[in-house]
Amino acid sequence: MDSSYLPSGYKPLLDIRQTQVAIKKVKDFFERDLAIQLNLTRVSAPLFVRSDSGLNDTLNGVERPVAFDIKDMDSDVEIVQSLAKWKRRALKDYGFKPGEGLYADMNAIRRDEDTDNLHSVFVDQWDWEKIITPEQRNVDTLKRTVRAIYRSLRHTETYIAEEYDFVGKFLPDEISFITTQELEDMYPDLTPKQRETEIARDKGAVFIMQIGGKLRSGKPHDGRAPDYDDWSLNGDIVVYYPLLDMAYELSSMGIRVNAESLASQLEERGCPERAELPFQRDLLNGNLPLTMGGGIGQSRMCMFFLRKAHIGEVQASIWPQETVDAFRAQGVCLL
């Protein structure tokens, strides 16, 4: 069920056409800055992959991908849910070296998404990945990369604030770091999402680390597929969004599994049979490079920097008609 709402008294500060112009400004500026910060080359990306390749992202393990057959092929294909695993293979196939990386515009359909102000069945993000060395496979590398991405976010906010005087600046000078276990210890009686809002409200911007494995409570902070992020070396970039008074995730990222952590996480998740899929088998056999990577929401970023109340104001998607009508009655058009 859609749980979208409008904050009391909210009125868009840009009309639809002005918003379209502003969206391009946000995307163009951030994309250029990110490529410089992380030494990334833009590449073309697939919209769908073979169902039997093991390349699609299984997300939390319960979301159903959109699948269909192709007349001249002997296997079904799936719309990607992210490019997390495809990018790792592409780095090898395209001849990238340690310290070099790629990024792509990723469009996905997540049919089982619970829609609200931040979540849509259509996902658009910059998916990036770069090769690292065995010596770089540590938390210091992770934090250094988070700070580089955060610099791009702050540069973008400064640029948009100069273009539109109503934007102002929300982001603090530095991003903070905390693990999911530290967060659970601080707020044991709150849900994971409530904990995120509390720490985001306190810090302004925070990287919440180590997502996917079980905490001391016996429950994970959030779900993560077992075959791309190393759950001990990943996290989310979360900022505080005053307009909605909530934690606002802009990016999910991490150092990717090696053979050891992949085997361990498949076992913990109870799906060791996935080790027989082509991508996972190549990884276990040492045929893929060590990498780190992530996704950065394009519409999420535009919504945040243009101070919009709903992602449908910056993204053309499908919403329940009652939501569309209710928003239109208050002067807000969902694309």
PLM feature spans:
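Short connector loops at helix/strand junctions that flank enzyme active sites
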Residues: D74, E100, V123, K203, ...
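Extended, charged alpha-beta segments that form solvent-exposed binding/catalytic grooves
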Residues: A104-Q194
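A generic secondary-structure signal for well-formed alpha-helical elements
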Residues: L34-T41, I149-I160, A309
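Generic recognition of stable, solvent-exposed alpha-helical segments in well-folded globular domains
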Residues: V21-K25, F29, R137-R144, A148, ...
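A glycine-rich phosphate-binding loop feature that marks nucleotide/adenosyl-phosphate handling sites
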Residues: L47-S51, D165-L171, P320-V324
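A general structural signal for short secondary-structure junctions and capping/turn motifs
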Residues: F68-I70, K92-P98, L118-S120, G168, ...
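A translation/RNA-centric and nucleic-acid-associated enzymatic feature enriched
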Residues: I109, T180-L335
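Class II aminoacyl-tRNA synthetase-like tRNA-binding/catalytic domains
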Residues: D2-H119, D127-I131
